[in-house]
């Protein structure tokens, strides 16, 4: 089963890349964790932000196959505990479809992306920096896997 983080933004600091890769490599081969970066449109003073969000959303959805699962990361999504995420991860493994976690740009996700969501997940009611969100998602997916496999990392 493939897990993919499709995120708007690229050229992250080295510590973000290192953190992401650390958790991605810890997962077993049958649970591959991939990162797909969507270029962020440059926002200027008179930028058409609505158009940029729409373009970024189209680019995100173009990376998703017709039968793949979409989980959007939204402040108004459902908060999951580690144990609840482990239950979801187990369901996704049984379903065996690719799971795409969608993280929008500074203004959030395009409505078209949200409309395609199978599930909506909230990491926190706090506003989190997008570089940190990448690492959090990787770590939480790894932690959920350790819960399912009885690995001592979670304790």
Curated annotation (Swiss-Prot):
NCBIfam families: PRK00103.1-4, tRNA_RlmH_YbeA. It is found in: Cytoplasm. The keyword S-adenosyl-L-methionine applies. Homodimer. It catalyses: pseudouridine(1915) in 23S rRNA + S-adenosyl-L-methionine = N(3)-methylpseudouridine(1915) in 23S rRNA + S-adenosyl-L-homocysteine + H(+). This is Ribosomal RNA large subunit methyltransferase H. It comes from the Bacteria. HAMAP family: 23SrRNA_methyltr_H. InterPro entries: Alpha/beta_knot_MTases, RlmH-like, tRNA_m1G_MTases_N. GO terms for molecular function: rRNA (pseudouridine-N3-)-methyltransferase activity. Belongs to the RNA methyltransferase RlmH family. Its EC number is 2.1.1.177. Pfam families: SPOUT_MTase. The lineage of its organism: Bacteria, Pseudomonadati, Pseudomonadota, Gammaproteobacteria, Pseudomonadales. The keyword Isomerase does not apply. Keywords: Cytoplasm, Methyltransferase, rRNA processing, S-adenosyl-L-methionine, Transferase. PANTHER family: METHYLTRANSFERASE, RIBOSOMAL RNA LARGE SUBUNIT METHYLTRANSFERASE H. S-adenosyl-L-methionine binds at residues 73, 104, 123-128. CDD domains: RlmH-like.
